[in-house]
């Protein structure tokens, strides 16, 4: 029988961590935090956790890491993320939770000068980064993982989708053999389970409860009515969310069409420079743009807790991407909606997603 921890005081955490948690405004642990934190702190097993975006999974491993890592022993923990945006978010979350503990966190990802990273690695206790740049440092001899006790693989299914698994294996093999491994993934494709079997031996499997705060529905329209249907959904003045498209070209065209008729819409796509992309995300977080059009690839790393809706203007390629998309809303205990716009031919694909992910997606009456 699983224990329900009603507040963080019951998790045997230090006063330092409890103060940091209070300062962040966390009131009680989420489902994944209740399950992972005590197991990570009090057990020697490796952990595989199925938890979606917005479930509180980052804090579920950040809190025990802060308690367990010794600030005087060099690099004891490494966290791999699929994108630099997620690496920054994870590092920032650890910084915000470490309180008075003098832990040094190094952010290691591409697109930044390598020499400041080399300097940061010399004093680091926890390394957070993307596989490519981490491997670069290992090959240069500027990152030694032989003392690593804790290896965290975040968003493993996204790593798989982006072709990073071979790099992940190289990094695993560069680490101390006695390390503990924690693997987090929104979905559990066969390849991820094979990875766990190969490197983790016996492990505890944890599955977070499905987020009941997300109301999922679909609208069925003729293809030539898709844009009109979107506009009707966006007319709600309270709308603040993401609209997912299939291609880069679609995102640009859709954002332009929406702006032409008065909507505060922005797009994030591969033709933007990093600074342009950061500007769009900043405007979105400030709610100067309330509608952000994106593809699956370009939306990775957008971390906003109060989005009230996600719209699939086009259905994603697979059920896993659907779960990552809808996990952008209904976060931090708030309610959210996920609405898919489909034509008649796409109905079977939607039902396949529903069956594969054990969901209930109801038809929205559009009268």
UniProtKB/Swiss-Prot annotation:
Q: List the disulfide bonds.
A: none
Which segments does the entry list as coiled coil? none
Q: Which InterPro entries match?
A: DEAD/DEAH_box_helicase_dom, DEAD_box_RNA_helicases, Helicase_ATP-bd, Helicase_C-like, P-loop_NTPase, RNA-helicase_DEAD-box_CS, RNA_helicase_DEAD_Q_motif
According to its UniProt record, which reaction does this protein catalyse? ATP + H2O = ADP + phosphate + H(+)
Q: Where are the transmembrane segments?
A: none
Which keywords describe this protein according to UniProt?
Answer: ATP-binding, Helicase, Hydrolase, Nucleotide-binding, RNA-binding
Name of the top EC class for this enzyme: hydrolase
Name assigned to this protein: Probable ATP-dependent RNA helicase MJ0669
């Amino acid at each position: 029988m699983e224990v329900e921890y009603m507040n963080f005081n019951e998790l045997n955490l230090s006063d330092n961590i409890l103060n940091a948690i209070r300062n962040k405004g966390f009131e009680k642990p989420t489902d994944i935090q209740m399950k992972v934190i005590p197991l990570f702190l009090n057990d020697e097993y490796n952990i595989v956790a199925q938890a979606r975006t917005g479930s509180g999974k980052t804090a579920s491993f950040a809190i025990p890491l802060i308690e367990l890592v010794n600030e005087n022993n060099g690099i004891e923990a490494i966290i791999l993320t699929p994108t630099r945006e997620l690496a920054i978010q994870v590092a920032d979350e650890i910084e915000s939770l470490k309180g008075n503990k003098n832990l040094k966190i190094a952010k290691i990802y591409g697109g930044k000068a390598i020499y400041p990273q080399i300097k940061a690695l010399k004093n680091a206790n926890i390394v957070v980064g993307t596989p490519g740049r981490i491997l670069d440092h290992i090959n240069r001899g500027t990152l030694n993982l032989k003392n690593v006790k804790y290896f965290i693989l975040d968003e493993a299914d996204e790593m798989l989708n982006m072709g990073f698994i071979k790099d992940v294996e190289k990094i695993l093999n560069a680490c101390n053999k006695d390390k503990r491994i924690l693997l987090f993934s929104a979905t559990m494709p066969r390849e991820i389970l094979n990875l766990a079997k190969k490197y983790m031996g016996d492990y505890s499997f944890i599955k977070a409860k499905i987020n009941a705060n997300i109301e999922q529905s679909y609208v069925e329209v003729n293809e030539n009515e898709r844009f009109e249907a979107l506009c009707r959904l966006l007319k709600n003045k309270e709308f603040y969310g993401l609209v997912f498209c299939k291609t880069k070209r679609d995102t640009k065209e859709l954002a332009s069409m929406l702006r032409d008729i008065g909507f505060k819409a922005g797009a994030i796509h591969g033709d933007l420079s990093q600074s342009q992309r950061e500007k769009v995300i900043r405007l979105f977080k400030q709610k100067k743009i309330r509608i952000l059009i994106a593809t699956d690839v370009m939306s990775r790393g957008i971390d906003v807790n109060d989005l009230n809706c996600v719209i699939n203007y086009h259905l994603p390629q697979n059920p896993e991407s659907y779960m990552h998309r809808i996990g952008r809303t209904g976060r931090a205990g708030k309610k959210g909606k996920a609405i898919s716009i489909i034509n008649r031919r796409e109905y079977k694909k939607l039902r396949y997603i529903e069956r594969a992910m054990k969901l209930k997606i109801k038809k929205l009456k559009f009268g």
